[in-house]
UniProtKB/Swiss-Prot annotation:
Assembly: Homodimer.
Upper classification of the organism: Bacteria, Pseudomonadati, Pseudomonadota, Gammaproteobacteria, Pasteurellales
Disulfide bonds: none
GO molecular function: magnesium ion binding; manganese ion binding; NAD+ diphosphatase activity; NADH pyrophosphatase activity; RNA NAD-cap (NMN-forming) hydrolase activity; zinc ion binding
Biological processes annotated in GO: NAD catabolic process; NADH metabolic process; NADP catabolic process
Co-factor binding comment: Divalent metal cations. Mg(2+) or Mn(2+). Binds 1 zinc ion per subunit.
Domain Nudix hydrolase: 126-253
Protein name as annotated: NAD-capped RNA hydrolase NudC
Amino acid sequence: MKILQQDDFGYWLLTQGSNLYLVNNELPFGIAKDIDLEGLQAMQIGEWKNHPLWLVAEQESDEREYVSLSHLLSLPEDEFHILSRGVEINHFLKTHKFCGKCGHKTQQTQDELAVQCTHCGYQTYPVICPSIIVAVRRGHEILLANHKRHYSPNGGIYTTLAGFVEVGETFEQAVQREVFEETGISIKNLRYFGSQPWAFPNSQMVGFLADYESGEITLQESEIYDAQWFSYDQPLPELPPTGTIARKLIHATLELCKAEHKCD
C-alpha cells in the first residue's frame, strides 16, 4: 500500500468488513483531498470506467455511513463484482497480517496480490472457498428449501440447495452429496449453469441445474427447516433477492418447467 497524496485521483473503495461507503449509491470519485483521504493507506486494485480504482485501508474509527454489500445486489452485475472484489481483498489483508507458518508479520508483495512473511518468506494468496449451488427440477416442479438461517415466523426465504466443496471432492460430487444430505433426494443430468463471487466473506458460488432421479424428501434438520416441491404455475414463497445466482437458477428452472408443460 502507499500513503495517499492530496492529488491522487480515481474511484475509491472504502470498506468496513462487508460494508461499503457509497455516495448516491455510487463509488466516490475524485481526488483524495476532496474526499478526506489524504494521508491514508491505499492500493490500486485495477480500473473502473477508465480511471484508477483504489482500495483504502480499513479505518478503525470512521464517521462515514456504510451500507452492507448484501443490500447492493440490485446494482449492475459488473459494479457489484467490483464492490465484492474490494470486500474480499480487504478481508484477506485483515486476516493475513501474520504468517500462518511461523507467526511473524507479513508484508504485501509488490508484483502480485499476495502477502509474504518478513521472517521465513512464506507467501500467501487470497483464500477463495468454493461452494456449489443447485436447482433441482422434477417435471413441472422445482425443489426449494427454507434453510434455518432464512427462517422467520412468516415463512422466510425458500431457495436452492448449496454448500461448500470438501477437500478432495469435485464440484459434481459436492452437488450430489449436498442434495442428498440436505433432502434425501438423488439427482441426475447435472449441468453447469454459471458462477458468482460471494464476498461473505470469500466464497465462489458455482451453480448447476439438475433433474430429480429418486427419493422422498428427508430433511437434514440441523440445516433445513422445510423443503418442498413447487409447481411453476402455483404461488411461490419468498425467493432470494434479484441479482443472486440462486434467483437466476430458480428463474432458469421455472422456464424449463414451463417448456416441459407445453410439450406435454
